[in-house]
Amino acid sequence: MQLEDFMRYPDLVCQAAQLPRYTWNGRRSLEVKRNLAKRIIFWLGAVNLVYHNIGCVMYGYFGDGRTKDPIAYLAELASVASMLGFTIVGTLNLWKMLSLKTHFENLLNEFEELFQLIKHRAYRIHHYQEKYTRHIRNTFIFHTSAVVYYNSLPILLMIREHFSNSQQLGYRIQSNTWYPWQVQGSIPGFFAAVACQIFSCQTNMCVNMFIQFLINFFGIQLEIHFDGLARQLETIDARNPHAKDQLKYLIVYHTKLLNLADRVNRSFNFTFLISLSVSMISNCFLAFSMTMFDFGTSLKHLLGLLLFITYNFSMCRSGTHLILTSGKVLPAAFYNNWYEGDLVYRRMLLILMMRATKPYMWKTYKLAPVSITTYMATLKFSYQMFTCVRSLK
């Protein structure tokens, strides 16, 4: 098994939106140069994603609520605000993916070096690889299904209106966005807006999935190493003449893992903060919009709500598993037969135990930990906001 095997799905989402693929020393498959057509697809998606932010703001600015029911108008604004949350997260993730490409590739180089050292040892690589692949495969299938439904909904609604002998077509695009051309009442303008949002949605979903998978990738690699470190600590025989050398190696190994985990944390600090804070507000708006529209549109908002929930759950799940796995180091050191070692061995083991007193956890700028506890707190806050807004009806 190679480190590259863990990057199957991240590479797949890069290919879907023609995003630049990450490379590092030791990767077997070489980087495929994108031709002109692929670069055009990428830039169409990126430009439309950036414009989508502007279009949502302009739609809210130009919207006239005087001719509508106040509650319906509020639901429409909530729908626009929730979509703006999606595009903000996607745009920032795209910026991070491109601007920190070299930094992430350097991290991948270091994880590759560590992986080459352990792949022939008794590490549970296959166990963690299966767990990781199963999780992101299910996430990939759900996101793909959501994208297909989201982008096909305008066409399906127009076909239904056409065959139901409706006197006037709705011309409803994927999300309420302002465009500098006529959309309502214009077939070419309608399909142009739908095409723009298809490119925007494709890039948005692929970038968000890539960042989500990359966080899970780094998390599962750290889990493999912390688990292997704990298992090696348990098997050290303090009576062995080479025990001090083995323990010294593990102390250096543990220090390197903590440094790598800190670098990963610093790389995703902004992502953690934006994702958790934006999702709290967007979940409230999506839940409110879901209760105000027809079945097809409500299902679209339900999928959006589930996308935000699974996006944050995936990050917090990875952080929680890292906490649990890194927490194995201290018990492994304690239950080692240290009492049969000499004084130098005991002092060295004490150094490692002091560093492993608390399990390692990712944090958002040293504030809230990235864990299921924080995830549940964000859901609770979103629900409180939803009940408050819903009571206004």
Curated annotation (Swiss-Prot):
CC per GO annotation: cation channel complex; dendrite membrane; plasma membrane
Biological process per Gene Ontology, one example term: signal transduction
InterPro entries linked to this entry: 7tm6_olfct_rcpt
Signal sequence segment: none
Membrane topology according to the record: Multi-pass membrane protein
Segments crossing the lipid bilayer: 40-60, 70-90, 139-159, 209-229, 270-290, 306-326, 366-386
Cytoplasmic compartment residues: 1-39, 91-138, 230-269, 327-365
Subcellular location: Cell membrane
Pfam family name, one: 7tm_6
Any one Gene Ontology molecular-function term assigned to this protein's record: olfactory receptor activity
Tissue: Expressed in olfactory sensory neurons in the antenna.
Superkingdom of the source species: Eukaryota
Further comment found in the protein's record: The atypical heteromeric and topological design of the odorant receptors appears to be an insect-specific solution for odor recognition, making the OR/Orco complex an attractive target for the development of highly selective insect repellents to disrupt olfactory-mediated host-seeking behaviors of insect disease vectors. Odor-evoked OR currents are independent of known G-protein-coupled second messenger pathways.
Family of this protein: Belongs to the insect chemoreceptor superfamily. Heteromeric odorant receptor channel (TC 1.A.69) family. Or49a subfamily.
Function: Odorant receptor which mediates acceptance or avoidance behavior, depending on its substrates. The odorant receptor repertoire encodes a large collection of odor stimuli that vary widely in identity, intensity, and duration. May form a complex with Orco to form odorant-sensing units, providing sensitive and prolonged odorant signaling and calcium permeability.
Protein name: Putative odorant receptor 69a, isoform B
Native species: Drosophila melanogaster
Gene symbol of the encoding locus: Or69a
